[in-house]
Amino acid sequence: VEYHPYLWHPSRDRTIVHIDTTHAEVDGHYSISLAVVGNIRHSLNRVAAITTPHQGKAMRTLRDSLITEMNMHRDDLEFPVKPQKIIWDLRTAMDLQDIVICDVGAHKMWMSRMFRCEYPNTCIISNGFASMGIAVPGAIAAKLANPQRKVVAVTGDAGFLMNSQEIETAMRLNIAIVILVWNDASYGLIEWKQQNQFGRTSHVQFTNPDFVQYAQSFGAVGVRVEETEQLMPILKEALDRNTVTVIDCPVDYRENLKLTEALGQLTLTI
């Protein structure tokens, strides 16, 4: 899933080196000067070996700005919990080689932007097909494939309800996972898009069950975050349990439009 070349190459005057497993498609805004087709891992290593070091500081500046953004709300105690704070606490509570399976919704926008990854396949997001409901069964699969690692399903309340019955599977097979539910009683991403495009929302709110009692009905542990400072210890305790834990975490999505406004002021130069 990528932006069409006409959005980032309107001038059509740049030199483009195409590095992919397949040949480039013909496009007026994507006229390549060189194609490196093959295993991307090996291709990048070979290209890196023959290129000259980049002396510019643009990437360093970008990296520093991202780090600043990631750290901005680390000590924020407002409630409901800001998306940035949830991600900070989650990243801090988990080891770097633990695994996150991210569902689809407003939380996916925040996770893909701000969740720091140091190892391959430690943050898996359904981005192409954008399949709501992937997080819980995906976390079960990840734990089966990597029983030595902690696994967390990060999901919105809507995505969680689409496949939450798979808690039964996890309990029956004794698969210990953590399910972190970002609770806003809404289709958060659709609400975000409606606010951006129309300045209002329509038919996106719904009523949730009691997620704590719902988890307990399967024999799992259910915990509700009632103060922001509770989130970190709740996460750590959940990661240490040898069973399924569902964490109901109210999220403050008033941050969404602030992010939209900030991103609208950015300009990418290539």
Where are these regions (language model features)?
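Conserved thiamine diphosphate
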Residues: A35, S43, A49, Q195-I234
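A short alpha/beta connector and helix-capping loop motif
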Residues: S31-L44, E166-N183, K258-E261
